[in-house]
A protein has these predicted regions:
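Active-site histidine-anchored catalytic micro-motif
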Residues: 1-116
Length: 116
């Protein structure tokens, strides 16, 4: 059974250019993380947003919800920034017949010591 991984940005995919600079949200890192962990499960990755979760609007939560509802997979992982993950989870609570897991990171996946 295939798992859908929907990415929204957050710390998971942040890129810092140096210790004093701003960041950007890069391409999703989840495939390389799973490859590095020798994960052999069937999955597909879909990038929905590339934002810090503090910048996600209610309209964008609607986009996330629509993507979840339209997803053919019943098992869905959403990578999301930790600051507003709870708000998005509450927004998705009425989606039925799908198992939805939101996950985030405190350190970007591109860092050597990451929790992504």
């Amino acid at each position: 059974m295939r798992i859908a991984i929907l990415t929204t940005g957050g710390t998971f995919d942040k890129i810092y250019f140096d210790a004093n600079s701003e960041y950007s949200i890069g391409e999703p890192c989840i495939s390389s993380i799973l490859d590095e962990g020798n994960v052999m499960s069937d999955y597909r990755v879909q990038s929905i947003l590339k934002k810090d979760s503090l910048d996600i609007t209610q309209d964008e939560r609607e986009i996330i919800k629509k993507s979840v509802i339209e997803c053919e997979e019943e098992r869905i992982i959403i990578t999301h920034g930790t600051d507003t993950m709870v708000e998005t989870a509450k927004f998705l609570e009425d989606v039925k017949e799908k198992t939805i897991v939101l996950t985030g990171a405190m350190q970007p996946a591109r860092f050597k010591k990451t929790d992504a």
